[in-house]
């Protein structure tokens, strides 16, 4: 019975969360369309399971008398400080009940998953492979369906309940129907781009460290998955995701070149050659189809796009977010930004920068705590870069932090919980 409560149930629930993230969006839309009375509970299924896991982990730590060990851990200290600061802001700058609850879930769920996974897997490392396989299975679903959407009808998700009141089955680039942005099983093209960029970086890191040790069949499978992930990034038409891929894969390439004792001159020449090829290919592509570059890359095609593009919306959002954050250094309250703000005054305030998003809600102190926590995890991953999971999570995490400059990337549950779960597995790994 003790093993069931302290070991088996947390493992089952974490596996369910890790796999269920891949199908969370279509599941909640489908249930909401057919059984709207149960929609709210279904949306919170992973948070409910996570709360139970946290409770069981606390019980296990208490029974094992490990509090001194974990309270002296810098990652745990920063995570607790980040959570407690939310409580302080909630008292100092109160918001409505539903907005506060929604804001707490959005802000803390990925940190809670990372902490729960970190502590649980440290105590029971035999479940690390289980959890990693669940994340891998979820990635196959997300990337596989994204590839299928390249040939499926663009409204294939409508029968599940997708639409203007839930999640759009697809989007376009600045209202130009020529360029359709796919969602896969996520909440939109930008989350898909961020997710696929992380998966692609992990695959490249795995290949860079394990290529000589794996079979030819696995190499083909790895190459196929990398190609599909790259297609998913491309078809999302997310420029920030393309930048994240460049950063993540670039980190893997540069670090491996240095570790292989290649001369810096060779590395620099190689980087220059890749950049030069990119410029040449881009120039040829622009000459062949200037509308593609104008629409997808520059968002500046007057023949199709509206006068108000996503770029102009983003600039307006950044200006408003920075002004508000400077005016209210303690923040405007948990749940005052993003989708949670709809539950307060009924008006959603969107800030297209994750760091300004956090500063707007919980102030500059809250932002510093999040940056310190994320940096601490990245440092741990860097120190374990000889293992592919840690190396890939580090490079992918840097890519996501770059996306955060343009989008509130960690607001999306699937993307945020994917990376924080991966990072937790990686900083406890022993050579997967």
What are these regions (language model features)?
Residues 26-27, 293-294, 298-362:
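Long extracytoplasmic/lumenal interhelical loops at the membrane interface
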Residues 83-91, 112, 116, 129-258, ...:
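Alpha-helical transmembrane segments of multi-pass inner-membrane proteins
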Residues 144-154, 236, 253-305, 319-326:
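A membrane-periplasm/extracellular boundary helix in multi-pass inner-membrane enzymes
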Residues 9-29, 48-112, 398-401:
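N-terminal hydrophobic segments of proteins, predominantly signal-anchor/transmembrane helices
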Residues 1-6, 11, 267, 271-280, ...:
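A juxtamembrane structural motif centered on a specific transmembrane helix
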Residues 13-18, 220-229, 382-407, 426:
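Loop-to-helix entry and N-terminal half of a specific, functionally important transmembrane alpha helix
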Residues 184, 188-190, 230-232, 317, ...:
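A conserved mid-to-late transmembrane alpha helix and its immediate loop/hinge
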Residues 54-55, 245-250, 392-403, 409-432:
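Transmembrane alpha-helices of multi-pass inner-membrane enzymes
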């Amino acid at each position: 019975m003790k093993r069931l409560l302290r070991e088996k149930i947390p493992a089952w629930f974490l596996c369910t969360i890790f796999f269920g993230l891949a199908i969370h969006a279509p599941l909640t839309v489908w249930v909401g369309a057919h059984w709207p009375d149960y929609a709210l509970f279904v949306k919170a299924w992973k948070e409910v399971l996570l709360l139970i896991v946290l409770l069981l982990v606390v019980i296990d730590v208490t029974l094992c008398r490990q509090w001194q060990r974990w309270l002296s851990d810098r990652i745990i200290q920063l995570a607790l400080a980040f959570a407690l600061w939310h409580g302080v802001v909630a008292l100092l700058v109160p918001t409505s009940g539903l907005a506060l609850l929604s804001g707490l879930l959005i802000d803390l769920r990925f940190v809670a998953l990372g902490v729960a996974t970190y502590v649980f897997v440290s105590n029971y490392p035999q479940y690390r492979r289980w959890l990693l396989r669940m994340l891998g299975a979820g990635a196959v679903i997300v990337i596989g369906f994204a590839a299928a959407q390249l040939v499926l009808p663009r409204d294939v998700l409508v029968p599940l309940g997708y639409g203007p009141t839930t999640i759009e089955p697809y989007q376009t680039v600045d209202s130009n129907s020529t360029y359709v942005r796919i969602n896969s099983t996520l909440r939109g093209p930008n989350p898909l781009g961020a997710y696929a960029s992380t998966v692609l970086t992990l695959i490249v890191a795995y290949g860079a460290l394990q290529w000589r040790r794996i079979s030819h069949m696995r190499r083909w499978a790895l190459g196929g998955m990398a190609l599909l992930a790259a297609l998913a990034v491309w078809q999302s038409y997310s420029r920030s995701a393309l930048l994240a891929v460049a950063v993540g894969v670039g980190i893997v390439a540069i670090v491996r070149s240095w570790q292989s004792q290649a001369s810096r001159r060779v590395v620099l020449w190689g980087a220059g050659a890749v950049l030069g090829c990119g410029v040449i290919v881009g120039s040829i592509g622009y000459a062949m189809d200037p509308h593609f570059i104008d629409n997808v890359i520059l968002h500046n095609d007057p023949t199709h796009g509206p006068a108000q593009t996503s770029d102009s919306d983003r600039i307006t959002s950044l200006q408003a977010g920075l002004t508000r954050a400077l005016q209210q250094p303690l923040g405007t309250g948990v749940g005052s930004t993003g989708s949670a703000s709809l539950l307060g005054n009924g008006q959603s305030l969107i800030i297209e920068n994750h760091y300004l998003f956090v500063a707007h809600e919980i102030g500059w102190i809250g932002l510093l705590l999040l940056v310190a926590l994320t940096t601490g995890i990245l440092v741990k991953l860097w120190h374990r870069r000889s293992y592919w999971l840690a190396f890939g999570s580090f490079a992918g995490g840097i890519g996501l932090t770059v996306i955060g400059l343009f989008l509130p990337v960690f607001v999306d549950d699937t993307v945020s919980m994917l990376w924080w779960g991966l990072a937790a597995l990686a900083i406890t790994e022993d050579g997967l």
